[in-house]
Amino acid sequence: MRPTALGFIGVALFATGLGSYFAFLPQSAGAVAFWVFAGGPALVLSAFAAAWASREELLREWFTPKWGDFTRGVVGTALLFCLAWAFVHLVAPIGSKREIWLVTLYGQIGDPHLLQAHAPAIAATIAAVATAEEIVWRGAVTSFLAERVGSRTAWAWAAGLYALSYVPTAWSLRAVGPEGGWNPMLPIAALGGGLVWGGMARVFGRLPPSIVAHALFDWAVIMMFPLWGVR
């Protein structure tokens, strides 16, 4: 693997981990800072990733649209949502000790009524960050890893690193009190999402289907069909 590729992966891990840690600290709950820390690193990294992909003549290949991309994205969203719903209801159901994982996570995102009042801005933010994350993780990072492990498994390795970048949130989202402790919800969600979106990028050879699936899933679990509480 080239030093520049290894360096980019390291920076992506560090920047995403640092941003996600601060995004999910209690003082960022429901504030603009949450969205800045959560999405800012991906937006910055995606600019460098896109510039590299353009020089390597990969950007056009990644974003060439094809008929049915949106439908593929919807199917991917439905699959991931079903997996997330099943996981939550099996591992952290309402009334269980692990419900606190979801309580702290959704509490961090903010007041549902305030989110609904700013729905267009939230939608634009989700779309931009989802696109940026796909460029970084399913695009650049996967391509860099393919140089080392081959294209057949690079997408799975990228999903693992994507999940690793969210491990710091296990500390920032930890709950206090007798039911407290580390909160693994986001690393688990990132692993599941990374595998689904990475698999889509691998199968279809492009990013639009995974971008649609990523953005729609985030919109669904935040704004339309939350996995905990009422939005």
What do these predicted ranges mean?
Residues 10-27, 62-70, 97-106, 127-136, ...:
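Hydrophobic alpha-helical transmembrane segments
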Residues 19-28, 90-91, 168-175:
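Juxtamembrane "helix-exit" motif on the non-cytosolic side of transmembrane helices
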Residues 116-231:
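Transmembrane helix-loop-helix hairpins at the membrane interface
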Residues 31-32, 58-129, 178-182:
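Juxtamembrane helix-loop-helix connectors linking adjacent transmembrane helices
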Residues 9-13, 42-43, 73-85, 122-126, ...:
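Alpha-helical transmembrane spans of integral membrane proteins, capturing the lipid-embedded, hydrophobic core
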Residues 3-11, 34-37, 68-76, 117-121, ...:
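Alpha-helical transmembrane segments of integral membrane proteins
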Residues 27-31, 58-68, 142-150, 201:
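Membrane-interface helix-boundary motifs at transmembrane edges
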Residues 2-57, 103-112, 120:
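Alpha-helical transmembrane segments in multi-pass membrane proteins
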